[in-house]
């Protein structure tokens, strides 16, 4: 039988609300179509997304959790499905904080598009990502799984070396350029599931 392609479907709506009248908290998801692993920008884009919301010291965590106190945790990540990736921001928050939480995501995106990331902050993310990659492939079994992944995904044999090089060598200027190209505010959809607030 012929293999079917299943790609994410994009809603025309900017905001989607799913009411749960008895919910004590709301689940917030913001997302857009993004890059897959074969895109030439993907490996350095991962560094941008990690800065944005991919680790505990990220921009989103520092602002929305640490400074504003709207949530215990907020994250951003790329799900690189075959043919089409998805960028998603995830958080849970008290119902009354939904709107201010969402509103704070956009200025953090703007900062990445307009300002150069300080060298110290970029270095911290590079060290974090390099360490995570090394820990992920430190056993024979994890290396074997990684090799299988490369083969079934149709990636280059040098994929993991390329990934480490991208993390080590990306510059603040490239981060700003990637944010301008791939973090489009107009394409970012907002989905909330929780109690309706007036």
Functional labels for PLM-detected ranges:
Residues 42:
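Double-stranded RNA-binding/processing signature
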Residues 91-94, 106, 132-133, 137:
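Conserved nucleotide- and phosphate/pyrophosphate-binding catalytic cores
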Residues 192:
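Charged phosphate-binding loop/patch that engages nucleotide di/tri-phosphates or the phosphate backbone
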Residues 1, 107-116:
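A common structural junction motif
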Residues 17-18, 66-71, 112-161, 165:
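Short acidic/His-enriched helical or mixed secondary-structure segments at domain edges of catalytic enzymes
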Residues 1-39, 50-103, 121, 146, ...:
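Non-catalytic beta-strand/loop surface segments
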